[in-house]
Amino acid sequence: AESCELTVEAVSNLLLGASVDFYLAMNLDGIATLNDMAGGVTVTLEDDFSTLDSEMAQGATITLHGDQAEIYVRSRRNLEIGTNEARMARQEQYMAKLFAQLDTRLQSDQNFSGVLFDALSPYLTTSMSRGRLINTAWTVKDYIRSEPLEISGEHRVGSDGFMQFYADEASLYEAVLDLFYEEAK
């Protein structure tokens, strides 16, 4: 919970003091469970994962089940293209398909959000009660999902020796205005 609270503080600071009321984090060990609760996610493999799973050859279209989902969204070191950009593109593709399937399940089964929460609870850290989370899932099921918001900036090695992202100030202000404010009429 402490790492989540530190993240809430960091995100609030990044977003120019915008309030972050709740948090929910999932341990990566929950990817397989989440994937399988959605019924598996079908993808066409642009990278070759066959050294990790023989069914995951480049060019194949497969429905990811169990550990295959984690291999798909996390792997980069065992691939010829070991960059994070390729992995991030896969993650965006995967999440779009996963969310669409979860939305469908939420629309068709009023109890699904509770079942999903119970299945994922060993992997979750959240400041939300079970009831609030279920009610929120039920409320947002009818929302129209917008494209992920991207803040421009640059990546460079920080004083600690690790790669860091430095947000473009104008892009950041624009994002905060888009997310948290409505134009006066």
Describe each PLM feature range.
Residues 22, 49, 99, 112, ...:
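Phenylalanine-focused residue identity feature
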